[in-house]
């Protein structure tokens, strides 16, 4: 056992590390939003809602059909004119999840393990990345963690209904945050009757009650999620649009979208079958930011190693703890497999398993530390303590190294100190920003811009932007008999200006069009577009 004085010193050390980590994330966040999803969705759609005076359908933005519980919160900082605050709103959900982990581990192990669990969670690279950007994933992490922990408490407290209600409400909030919450709903709806029936295996009445509790959980969760379902059904005839649209609207079936995730990876990255099948393990070791081939994010490899040690010495654990470890482990494994088979893997898609894996990892470390036999000498105990200490230090070192890399990449001090202005900072990461700012300052309020290969990043535009639809634009060019007809078709959609990303547009046109289409497109660009401004590989044109 650790001496009380040593434990107090370790507690203080971990608290200092926690405060340093939180301060670092706060500094990293204090720059203008430049992440892709923020500019296409999480800030762009709330801004449009604010300008419109309420929620309305935006057919050109597929993201606008997603559930938006957290996105609606971002309307508050946008209304106040400070979009940086949206990052701190998102970070709050990470802090709340860290508190949940701390509270659970404090009750199950001790204060020292609880502090380490919170520190480990908040410093994991993908959590840091999400904390300093405007996403919604940390909201999903928080609500799914609340849901599963209160499900465990429901069993612990003799199945008092209030804990099941809290779990179901949290699952409903998770659904309203991101569609990945559907996996949480499916798994926990199955877990509810399973957990209850394990206590009353020989009673027919209890089996009916187990089914009742599962149905009750499902009903409460879907009730909270229902406003988003109803909205989408009214607009698109598909409550989960754009998911499963081939079921609800078979006429809209896209052959490309029907390609499975395994085939996609084979086509895009030339991966072998073994490489693809090993993705559930590879994500813990090979993750890279901004690289879809390597899952667009980073985890800590120990999250897939240490949880297995949580099962060591199970016979000495209370039956309640054994059950909770199994449930947390089952949730993490099943969620990971569902995400793996359903779509091309991104680490952001599996964030709900991170809190359970952190809890299991801390249990694993605790088991390694406490593992002992009577014949073990004092020297072996010291070796075991040294091993745990080395593991803890190495885990935190991996996370700390990532945070240092973020300071280099984000460069917050240059902006905070005033050496770099807001527009200059944004333009460094989003080269189309200069063209968008020119349009904001020089185009009339009723201008309508077609954005072509600007990545749908329209948040910083104060003019209406209609985003480029590849299939529709190609169909328009294919059906045009002349450059004049192409101009007519574009103006007929109310388009007055175009913003074009040159490199991607040229590559796309050369690959997709034949001689006739290229001639029409060339005449259109030469005779019916007037270049107003160009910078950073992007140009603003006026239709003439």
Model regions and ranges:
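Signature aromatic-anchored transmembrane alpha helix within multi-pass, membrane-resident enzymes
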Residues: 7-19, 112, 162-170, 185-190, ...
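Transmembrane alpha-helix segments characteristic
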Residues: 18-19, 115-121, 166-171, 187-188, ...
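Membrane-proximal, lumen/periplasm-facing interface regions of secretory-pathway glyco-
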Residues: 30-44, 388, 394-438, 455-457, ...
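Hydrophobic/aromatic-rich transmembrane helices and adjacent perimembrane loops
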Residues: 47, 137-140, 174-179, 183, ...
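Transmembrane-helix signature of polytopic, membrane-embedded enzymes
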Residues: 84-85, 101-125, 142, 156-162, ...
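Hydrophobic, aromatic-rich transmembrane alpha-helices
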Residues: 94-98, 198, 279-322, 333
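Membrane-interface transmembrane helices that cradle and orient dolichyl/undecaprenyl
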Residues: 106-107, 147-163, 198-201
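Short periplasmic/luminal acceptor-recognition loop of GT-C membrane glycosyltransferases, typified by
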Residues: 425-468, 496-506, 541
């Amino acid at each position: 056992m650790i001496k009380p004085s040593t434990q107090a010193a370790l507690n203080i050390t971990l608290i200092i590390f926690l405060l340093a980590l939180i301060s670092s994330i706060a500094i990293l966040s204090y720059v203008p939003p430049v992440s892709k999803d923020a500019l296409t969705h999480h800030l762009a759609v709330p801004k449009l809602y604010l300008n419109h005076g309420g929620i309305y359908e935006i057919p050109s933005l597929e993201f606008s059909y997603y559930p938006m519980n957290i996105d609606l919160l971002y309307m508050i900082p946008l209304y106040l004119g400070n979009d940086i605050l949206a990052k701190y709103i998102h970070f709050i959900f990470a802090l709340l999840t860290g508190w949940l982990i701390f509270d659970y581990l404090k009750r199950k192990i001790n204060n020292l393990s609880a502090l380490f669990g919170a520190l480990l969670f908040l410093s994991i690279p993908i959590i840091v990345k999400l904390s300093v950007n405007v996403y919604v994933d940390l909201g999903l992490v928080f609500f799914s963690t609340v849901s599963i922990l209160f499900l465990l408490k429901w069993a612990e407290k003799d199945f008092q209904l209030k804990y099941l209600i809290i779990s179901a409400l949290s699952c409903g909030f998770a659904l309203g945050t991101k569609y990945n919450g559907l996996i949480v709903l499916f798994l926990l709806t199955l877990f509810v009757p399973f957990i209850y029936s394990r206590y009353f295996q020989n009673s027919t009445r209890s089996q009916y009650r187990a089914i009742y509790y599962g149905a009750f959980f499902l009903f409460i969760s879907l009730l909270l999620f229902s406003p988003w379902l109803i909205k989408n059904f009214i607009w698109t005839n598909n409550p989960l649009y754009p998911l499963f649209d081939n079921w609800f609207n078979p006429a809209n079936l896209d052959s490309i979208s029907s390609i499975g995730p395994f085939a996609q990876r084979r086509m895009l990255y030339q991966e072998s079958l073994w490489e693809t099948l090993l993705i559930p393990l590879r994500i813990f070791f090979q993750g890279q930011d901004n690289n879809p081939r390597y899952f667009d994010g980073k985890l800590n490899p120990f999250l897939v190693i240490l949880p297995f040690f949580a099962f060591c010495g199970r016979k000495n654990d209370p039956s309640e703890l054994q059950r909770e470890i199994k449930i947390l482990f089952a949730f993490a494994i099943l969620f990971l497999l569902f995400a793996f088979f359903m779509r091309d893997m991104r680490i952001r898609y599996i964030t709900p398993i991170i809190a359970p894996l952190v809890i299991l990892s801390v249990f694993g470390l605790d088991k390694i530390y406490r593992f002992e036999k009577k014949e073990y000498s004092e020297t072996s105990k010291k070796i075991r303590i040294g091993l745990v200490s080395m593991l803890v230090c190495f885990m935190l070192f991996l996370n700390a190294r990532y945070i240092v890399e973020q300071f280099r990449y984000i460069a917050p001090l240059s902006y905070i100190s005033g050496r770099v202005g807001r527009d200059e900072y944004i333009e460094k990461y989003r080269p189309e920003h200069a063209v968008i700012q020119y349009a904001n300052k020089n185009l009339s309020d009723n201008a309508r811009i077609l954005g072509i290969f600007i990545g749908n990043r329209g948040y910083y535009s104060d003019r209406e932007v209609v985003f480029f639809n590849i299939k529709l634009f190609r169909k328009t060019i294919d059906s045009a008999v002349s450059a004049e007809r192409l101009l007519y078709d574009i103006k007929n959609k109310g388009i007055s200006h175009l913003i074009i990303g040159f490199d991607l547009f040229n590559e796309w046109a050369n690959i997709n069009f034949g001689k006739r289409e290229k001639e029409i497109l060339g005449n259109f660009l030469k005779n019916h577009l007037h270049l107003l401004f160009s910078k950073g590989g992007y140009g603003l044109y006026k239709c003439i």
